[in-house]
Amino acid sequence: MNQIETFFDTMAERWDAVCVHDPGKIRTILDRTNLRQNARILDVGCGTGILESYLLPYEPRQIVAIDIAGQMIEKARMKYPDHPLIEFLQEDAMSYEGKGFDYIIL
């Protein structure tokens, strides 16, 4: 386990409380990307899955959300248990071999 993974694993439990997200800004940014329906989206550094609730209204075919920190992924999975469109994976973005995405969000 590297230092980055360790840091984010220790922050996972309180991440949503300490990391401020502006819903208006998130929606504006996503609207400007012209996300289309039925897209395959890769969310790199997904953390606790905050963006997924903003991505789902665009009716994607699939969202693959990756993060290096296993505890972040566990928190995200708890938010979307067994969601048919979202797959949360503990992966390093530099070694992830997924292919064929219409959009990649960093």
Specify the residue positions occupied by each region the protein language model found:
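Acidic active-site catalytic centers that drive phospho-/nucleotidyl reactions
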Residues: 16, 43, 67, 92, ...
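Class I SAM-dependent methyltransferase SAM/SAH-binding core
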Residues: 48-95
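Conserved class I S-adenosyl-L-methionine
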Residues: 1-36, 38-45, 50
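A conserved beta-strand element that flanks and buttresses the S-adenosyl-L-methionine
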Residues: 105
